[in-house]
UniProtKB/Swiss-Prot annotation:
This is Ornithine decarboxylase. It is an enzyme of class 4 (lyase). Its cofactor is pyridoxal 5'-phosphate. Its EC number is 4.1.1.17. One of its GO terms (cellular component) is cytosol. It comes from Haemophilus influenzae (strain ATCC 51907 / DSM 11121 / KW20 / Rd). It comes from the Bacteria.
Length: 720
């Protein structure tokens, strides 16, 4: 159990006693205290600040003067005590009792049980073999590891051989209590904690619902894990929905026409005409609730448009999950929908580790389908959990599970909602800083709202009004096509910036450009790590961890980068690591010279158009056989590795994609298209001509030829 401190005003120290550590009221942020003791004269100075935290820390007031405490503060005060010296012990016991109750209330079920278990100091003869870190401490290398992480991470890495904490696979005890609490917080019927990322969460959900022959309505933006789970593992038949890319390289949403019933029926007629007249032809639709680049869907709109055609809808919310805790985003949350027996069942997967409070790999699945219980299409817990156990380890890492538990506690509190509101405001202030102090790099938001500059509005107004983030189809700033009004908005918690090279008026290439990968490398050289970049776009994730000083540091570095661009600094000073590793290639180069060559490569290959065409129906690769069957051919080695120069028209054995974002450009079983071929050859050319900026590519293999050139290869099926 934790032992939080008592915060106090120096004026009252003599009027209570405690074995706990004390901290002066002026020196705490209130996250480390279990009770607060103030003098009556301090009430006006501190009580509003304490109340604003929304932590509900019990506050004791010592009446140190004749002035009575104003009754308007009563709803924020736990106890008021006098100066009676005979009752100091009584008052001290009251303070300690309140502190203990606060600590009990603050600890969620699984983490509470885990911390109590560690305190028991059991003697371990079970897994894991390091047994509380004792093994590590017997070797110098192990001791380094032990000292680096600290004792508790090892003590809490325990085995399910002791049933005290409950079973994580069949959901018993404290583990079950934690998931029930999370379901309550997120407004789900059931919640499943997953310890191998949302890649596994998606596969669990998809394997629970889909089988060979099922039709799955498939967002072409879906992460590769959805292809793996729905198509390669489950063997379902996809009907793809085309999606948008803009010239900057941002990932957009599904075209509005794709949600029209007549259009969907035309696709069914092409792919599975035998299902055309079924009431619900789609066993499942898989939709990205929010894209990697912060295009957010309206879940109510999606369900109203296509819900009657689907047994279930899976909203892959890997890149969101916090929307219901930000009031202006609530309408986009599928978990807050009012549903009836005619609606689809709802599944939501969330990467808690991305922008919520979880260790890496923590994820969760929310199941909201009791409104269809009793219908044949309903997947009950036992069947769903069978899929869960297919993908879950029998040796779970309990600290991961504990962070999921604590995350729910944070999000379920008023304090958690306050933190998200502050996060949104910090992001708004950062955008204003860029708009007011940078000239080349621009935030990806509307230029004006009702004729007034975006940055001239009050931050609080922007933080509570979605109008400041909406994609209106007639607006030109975003350059997305195919959207309907009120369909999408920019996630305020994705700090999106564009770099020079694309005309803001036409969306066409300009004469000079600054590819975002150059800015990303510059920032990494200076200790700032962006989430990702692509073409002329760069993304930074915003969470309640952010502070305005952190954002000021980022903007200051961006402004310094712009200065280097304007004065055309030598590359060796701007990107010293890239220069050092490739000095023969870049000797004597300036930063603008590098920018120009990379920009010219994009222009010559028209990469922005290639990237857009990869996800448009007219230029999607031709579907030849089910991805499951293509994968079987790969396993049986009925494949050959061919250079990309010879790959057009051949059937892919593997999915091909750049990572990030992890969205397949070619799916197993599809013919390699001219568009995909040209796109990956453009990446190959960049790797060869501009060393130091190679992207990560999966499903395409880069090999050095005898002439020293790096060439791209891909596996294709031999019998097709």
């Amino acid at each position: 159990m934790p032992n939080l401190k008592i915060a106090y005003s120096p004026k009252v120290e003599q009027y209570f006693s405690t074995n706990r550590e004390l901290v002066e009221i002026a020196k705490t942020d209130f996250t480390d205290v279990a009770a607060i003791v103030l003098s009556s004269s301090d009430v006006g100075e501190y009580l509003d600040r304490i109340k604003a935290t929304k932590f509900d820390v019990p506050v004791f007031i010592v009446q140190t003067d004749e002035q009575q405490v104003d009754p308007k503060f009563y709803d924020s005060i736990y106890h008021i005590q006098d100066l009676n010296g005979y009752d100091i012990k009584l008052y001290s016991r009251q303070i300690e009792t309140a502190a203990k109750l606060y600590e009990e209330k603050m600890l969620p079920p699984f983490f509470k049980m885990l911390s109590e278990y560690v305190e028991m100091g059991n003697i371990a003869f079970d897994c894991p073999g390091h047994q509380g870190g004792q093994y590590y401490r017997k070797h110098p290398a192990g001791r380094f590891l032990y000292d680096f992480y600290g004792e508790n991470i090892f003590r809490s890495d325990i085995c399910n051989a002791d049933v005290k904490l409950g079973d994580l696979l069949i959901h018993e005890g404290a583990a079950c209590d934690a998931q029930k609490y999370a379901a309550q917080v997120f407004n789900a019927d059931k919640t499943y904690f997953v310890l191998n990322g949302t890649s596994s969460s998606n596969k669990v959900a998809l394997n629970a619902v889909l089988a060979p022959g099922d039709l799955v309505l498939f967002d072409r933006n879906n992460h590769k894990s959805n292809h793996h789970g729905a198509l390669i593992q489950a063997g379902a038949t996809p009907i793809y929905l085309e999606t948008a890319r803009n010239p900057f390289g941002f990932i957009g949403g599904i075209d509005s026409h794709c949600f029209e019933e007549d259009y969907l029926k035309s696709l069914i007629k092409e792919v599975a005409p035998e299902k055309l007249n079924q009431k619900r032809p789609f066993r499942l639709a898989v939709i990205q609730l929010g894209t990697y680049d912060g295009t957010i869907y309206n879940a109510r709109q999606v369900v109203d448009k296509i819900g009657h055609l689907c047994d279930y809808i899976l909203f892959d919310s890997a890149w969101v999950g916090y929307e219901q805790f930000i009031p202006m985003m609530k309408d986009c949350s599928p978990l807050l929908l009012e549903l009836n027996e005619n609606d689809p069942g709802i599944l939501v997967t969330q990467s808690v580790h991305k922008q919520q409070a979880g260790f890496s790999q923590t994820s969760q699945i929310h199941k909201k389908d009791k409104h269809i219980k009793g219908q044949d299409r309903y997947v009950n817990h036992k069947r769903f959990n069978n899929a869960f156990m297919l993908h879950a380890s029998t040796s779970p890492f309990y600290p991961l599970f504990a962070t999921l538990d604590v995350n729910a506690k944070i999000q379920g509190s008023e304090a958690g909602r306050r933190l998200w509101h502050e996060c949104v405001k910090v992001g708004i202030e950062a955008r204003k800083l860029v708009l007011n102090h940078c000239e080349l790099i621009r935030p990806f938001i509307p230029t004006t709202i009702k004729g007034k500059k975006w940055q001239d509005y009050d931050t609080e107004e922007i933080a509570t009004n979605l109008e400041f983030f909406k994609f209106h189809p007639t607006d030109t700033w975003h350059k997305f096509e195919g959207y309907a009004d009120e369909q999408y908005f920019v996630d305020p918690c994705k700090f999106l910036l564009t770099t020079p090279g694309i005309s803001l008026e036409t969306g066409e290439y300009e004469e000079f450009g600054v590819p975002a990968t150059i800015l990303a490398n510059y920032l990494r050289e200076n200790g700032i790590i962006p989430e990702k970049c692509d073409l002329n776009s760069i993304l930074f994730l915003l969470t309640p961890a952010e502070t305005i000083t952190k954002m000021q540091t980022l903007v200051a570095q961006i402004a310094l980068f712009e200065k280097h661009i304007k004065q055309d600094s030598l590359l060796k000073y701007v990107l010293p690591t890239v220069y050092k590793n490739n000095e023969d290639r870049y000797k004597g180069y300036t930063i603008r010279q590098l920018c120009q060559e990379m920009h010219d490569l994009y222009v010559s290959r028209n990469v922005k158009q290639l990237q857009k065409d990869l996800f448009r129906k007219a230029t999607l690769p031709e579907y030849v056989l089910n991805p499951h069957d293509a994968n079987i051919e790969l396993i049986r080695n009925k494949v050959e590795l061919v250079p990309l120069t010879d790959i057009v028209g051949r059937v892919a054995a593997e999915g091909a994609l750049p990572y990030p974002p992890g969205v397949l450009c070619v799916v197993p079983g599809e013919k390699w298209s001219t568009t995909a071929h040209q796109y990956f050859l453009a990446l190959e050319e960049g790797i060869n001509t501009l060393p130091g900026f190679a992207p990560e590519i999966q499903g395409v293999y880069l090999q050095k030829d005898p002439d020293g050139r790096t060439r791209a290869y891909g596996y294709v099926l031999t019998d097709y």
